[in-house]
Design a protein with these regions (language model features):
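Short arginine-rich
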Residues: 77-92
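GIY-YIG nuclease catalytic motif and its immediate N-terminal context
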Residues: 1-47, 53-66, 70-77, 95-121
Length: 121
C-alpha cells in the first residue's frame, strides 16, 4: 500500500562544474550527475543550457564534489561572478579559492573535493 512506501530520500550529492566551449569560454553549473549533465549540454538528451547550444564541442575542465544543493548553489553564484582569468585559475590549480567564500563555512573549500573531468567524459 501507499502508506508502506518510504518517502524519505537520501540527500543528493551535488557537484560544481566548469565546462569549456569551442570559443574557449567557461560555463559554470551544478548537478547531481556530471555524466547526465554533460550529455544534456551536448544535446544527446534533453535539458541542456541555452547558453551552450551550438557551442560544442563541450568538455569538463573542473568538477568539484560540494555536498548539498544549497551550498552548491552558493558556490555556483560566486564562481559565475568571477573574471575569466580567475575561473581559469580554478581549473589550473584544481582548488576553489578560500577567500572567495569567506561568508561560507571555512571547511567548505577545504572539504570540497576536486574530481578529474576525465571520469565523466
Amino acid at each position: 500500500t501507499a502508506n508502506n512506501v518510504n518517502t524519505h530520500q537520501q540527500p543528493s550529492t551535488w557537484y560544481l562544474y566548469l565546462i569549456e566551449n569551442k570559443l574557449g569560454q567557461l560555463y559554470t553549473g551544478i548537478t547531481t550527475s556530471p555524466t547526465r549533465r554533460i550529455s544534456q549540454h551536448r544535446g544527446e538528451i534533453v535539458g541542456g543550457a541555452r547558453a551552450l547550444k551550438g557551442k560544442g564541442p563541450l568538455h569538463f575542465r573542473a568538477i568539484f564534489l560540494i555536498g548539498d544543493r544549497s551550498t552548491a548553489s552558493q558556490f555556483e553564484y560566486k564562481v559565475k561572478r568571477l573574471s575569466k582569468q580567475k575561473k581559469w585559475a580554478i581549473v589550473k590549480q584544481k582548488v576553489l579559492p578560500k577567500n572567495l567564500f569567506e561568508n561560507l563555512c571555512e571547511d567548505l573549500c577545504r572539504n570540497s573535493q576536486y574530481i578529474s573531468p576525465c571520469e565523466y567524459e
